[in-house]
């Protein structure tokens, strides 16, 4: 039986099964529903603008006032509630938004316009880019010969105080706080007849870079204002690391640290006044860190 005979036999069987009637089979083609898109003017609310200390998502809490009072004491994400076993969509979106802000702060740079506006002396560590800065922290504390000469040529030798600003792990921290904290430090130092000039700005900065700057300048006290690793609470936290006559390889115990400097922590103006007092005490007692009592 050839192919033609096989087709005829199949057609005959189908005709008998349908009572002698043949039907043409047409493949059903799914139709696409037309959805009209309505474009409205306006903007999507910024979810990061919501104050999570005042946001309570728990429905019908037993003690709403007590819950809100507890939330005012901490930036922790309390009272989020859930949809089944999962967090609510709003909570997830806020988490992702805060995480994105933290990432942006790490991988972005301090504006060059700000560096020029503040009349900083720009220098760079041996790190060539952000990737190297994150993977080679040792290079973030060293300067090549050219940068050493730039520091030496633009600073006062053996000054009582050398102020250094470093981008660190948060460029946002520097941009948010530096304009407020520097005048506060300067004003506080006037009470002790102290002053500073020629502020160094270090790109790709790690904290121990201040030790090398201390050796180059011969300053009695070096104060480094640096952006700290951002978290989900804020990307604008800055710290001040201060040391008396810092040297390369010195123990960390010789540094005095003021951390959590930002609008939601220690305000920069308040921190500046405290930094000025610490600098005065270090010069008076000729020590820093755990030796400063």
Curated annotation (Swiss-Prot):
Adenosylcob(III)alamin binds at residues 207, 228. Its cofactor is adenosylcob(III)alamin. It catalyses: ethanolamine = acetaldehyde + NH4(+). Catalyzes the deamination of various vicinal amino-alcohols to oxo compounds. Allows this organism to utilize ethanolamine as the sole source of nitrogen and carbon in the presence of external vitamin B12. It holds the Pfam family EutC. Pathway: Amine and polyamine degradation; ethanolamine degradation. GO terms for biological process: amino acid metabolic process; ethanolamine catabolic process. Its EC number is 4.3.1.7. The basic unit is a heterodimer which dimerizes to form tetramers. The heterotetramers trimerize; 6 large subunits form a core ring with 6 small subunits projecting outwards. InterPro entries: EutC (IPR009246), EutC_C (IPR042251), EutC_N (IPR042255). Coiled coil: none annotated. Its main location: other. One of its GO terms (cellular component) is ethanolamine degradation polyhedral organelle. This is Ethanolamine ammonia-lyase small subunit. GO terms for molecular function: cobalamin binding; ethanolamine ammonia-lyase activity. Keywords: Bacterial microcompartment, Cobalamin, Cobalt, Lyase. Binds between the large and small subunits. Belongs to the EutC family. It is found in: Bacterial microcompartment. Gene3D superfamilies: Ethanolamine ammonia-lyase light chain (EutC), Ethanolamine ammonia-lyase light chain (EutC), N-terminal domain.
